[in-house]
């Protein structure tokens, strides 16, 4: 499966995998979505080279502390923890736990990554049945008010980095919005991500500058829409932006 390995994520960007991860599971959709560990006999038939690769590293893999799975199905190559394996298979927001600004990227390609503790990555997606979408949440999370709240409560690290871990973002306020207001913001965020994609792909400096200007204008529009939902004035926004990076 495609995965992230020490990749820098950018605001309103699309996450791009730079490596591959062996995922020895099959996602089974039923009344409850589960991740079924592929057993050795099946792996030998379907993915013989993968099994050979894992077997060559068996001694190293067996030194890990394995949690999860029944005794009958547990294998030396299963992941150390398995409680979130099914959550990768859906559109989601990916963020670096440690950063010096809001950096929430979008993924709709089922990218894998490691996480937990101080990262390096964390995933967000709307609760099932919630009216908010990933794009709407990205707009709120990137807003200066949200980042000001994070900076006020976060843990700081060397180099000016501070945590955007679960405990610092899970209680951020989400403004009420009508379906039309949410749709408007979602459309702008989709355009903003596309503009950043175009800027990243541009090979001619002039084209890149044009796309970057377009992205900046779209970001201002998104910020303005969310500010209105929060009922914030220009002075309120200036105050939020003035909150310093924690020392």
Where are these regions (language model features)?
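Polybasic, glycine- and aromatic-enriched phosphate-binding surface used to engage nucleic acids
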Residues: 1-187
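Non-catalytic DNA-recognition/assembly elements of restriction-modification systems
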Residues: 49, 175-247
């Amino acid at each position: 499966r495609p995965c992230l390995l020490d990749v820098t994520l950018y605001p309103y960007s699309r996450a791009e995998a730079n490596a591959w991860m062996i995922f020895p599971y099959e996602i089974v959709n039923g009344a409850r979505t589960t991740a079924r560990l592929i057993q050795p006999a099946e792996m030998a038939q379907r993915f013989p080279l993968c099994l050979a690769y894992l077997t060559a590293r068996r001694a190293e893999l067996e030194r890990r502390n394995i949690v999860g799975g029944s005794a009958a199905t547990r294998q030396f190559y299963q992941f150390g923890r398995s409680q979130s394996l099914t959550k990768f298979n859906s559109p989601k927001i990916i963020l670096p736990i440690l950063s010096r600004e809001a950096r929430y990227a979008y993924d709709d390609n089922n990218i894998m990554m490691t996480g937990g503790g101080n990262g390096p990555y964390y995933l967000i997606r709307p609760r099932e049945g919630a009216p908010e979408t990933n794009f709407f949440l990205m707009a709120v999370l990137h807003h200066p008010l949200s980042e000001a709240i994070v900076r006020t409560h976060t843990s700081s690290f060397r180099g000016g980095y501070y945590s955007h871990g679960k405990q610092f973002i899970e209680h951020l306020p989400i403004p009420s919005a009508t379906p039309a207001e949410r749709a408007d913001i979602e459309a702008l965020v989709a355009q903003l991500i596309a503009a950043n994609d175009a800027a990243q792909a541009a090979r001619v400096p002039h084209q890149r500058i044009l796309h970057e200007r377009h992205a900046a204008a779209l970001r201002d529009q998104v910020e303005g829409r969310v500010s209105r939902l929060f009922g914030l004035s220009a002075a309120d926004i200036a105050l939020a932006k003035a909150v310093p990076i924690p020392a």
